[in-house]
Amino acid sequence: MDHYVKMEDGKVMPIQEMLKSIERYNPEHLKVIEAYVEDQAKDNKYDLEANLACLKLYQFNPQMMNLDVTYTILLKSLTNFPHTDFVLCKCLLLPAQMNDDSVKEIVYLADILEKCDFTLFWSRVQKNPQFFKKITGFSESIRKFVCHVVGITFQSIEKQYLVRLLGDVDDKVLNAWVKKNGWKEEGEYILVAQQEGNIKTKHITEKIDFENLGPLMANCL
């Protein structure tokens, strides 16, 4: 769904265009930005700039702070791991937000993800599944990150261990992720791409000027 903001002169501007201007700091646009944040959660889309703008407006206007929207922004940032979006969002939080129990839980989840303790992460999510249901594609996004970590860490992995890392998924979901990543099932193991294929040779080029080379050659005579 497209979102537009109305300027003081009556002109209508797309929200993405507004975010590139000084108008992003206008509190009159906050309701539109908040609606845009909620639509991101519903439509499985993501706009970090809009989410940061929303948190910045809360900083400037604490009386307008909305905790539900804050939860949505933080949970959406988790879905973009391993990028550092969550850190950027966390830096903009007010004390009132940081002291909220749900925010503390999301911060804890981010810490767990950063440590790649995926079994603990899923156990925390399963304690309050309703809290995450409003974020369409939340589990799939986290599983994408899990597969990213597995892909750069393992050459082969026990099938049941991978099942746990993905959140105790069934065979259908497991097979879908194995196929999506180009892995192969072999007995009780999943064969991950060879790590040698992920190693990139680094070429170092050193530039030596002729003026610097002259004295060196003279010393060799």
Swiss-Prot record:
Annotated coiled-coil positions are none
Transmembrane region(s): none
Provide an example Pfam family for this protein: CSN8_PSD8_EIF3K
User: What SUPFAM superfamilies does the entry give?
Assistant: ARM repeat, Winged helix' DNA-binding domain
Q: Which InterPro entries match?
A: ARM-type_fold, CSN8_PSD8_EIF3K, eIF3k, PCI_dom, Transl_init_fac_sub12_N_euk, WH-like_DNA-bd_sf, WH_DNA-bd_sf
Q: Which keywords belong to this entry?
A: Cytoplasm, Initiation factor, Protein biosynthesis
Gene Ontology biological process terms in this record = formation of cytoplasmic translation initiation complex; regulation of translational initiation
One example of the protein's molecular function in GO is: ribosome binding
What the record says about family reads: Belongs to the eIF-3 subunit K family.
Q: Which PANTHER family would you find in this protein's record?
A: EUKARYOTIC TRANSLATION INITIATION FACTOR 3 SUBUNIT 11, EUKARYOTIC TRANSLATION INITIATION FACTOR 3 SUBUNIT K
What interactions and quaternary structure are annotated?
Component of the eukaryotic translation initiation factor 3 (eIF-3) complex.
HAMAP family from the xrefs? eIF3k (MF_03010)
Q: What does this protein do?
A: Component of the eukaryotic translation initiation factor 3 (eIF-3) complex, which is involved in protein synthesis of a specialized repertoire of mRNAs and, together with other initiation factors, stimulates binding of mRNA and methionyl-tRNAi to the 40S ribosome. The eIF-3 complex specifically targets and initiates translation of a subset of mRNAs involved in cell proliferation.
Question: What protein does this entry describe?
Answer: Eukaryotic translation initiation factor 3 subunit K
- Species per Swiss-Prot/TrEMBL record: Culex quinquefasciatus (Southern house mosquito)
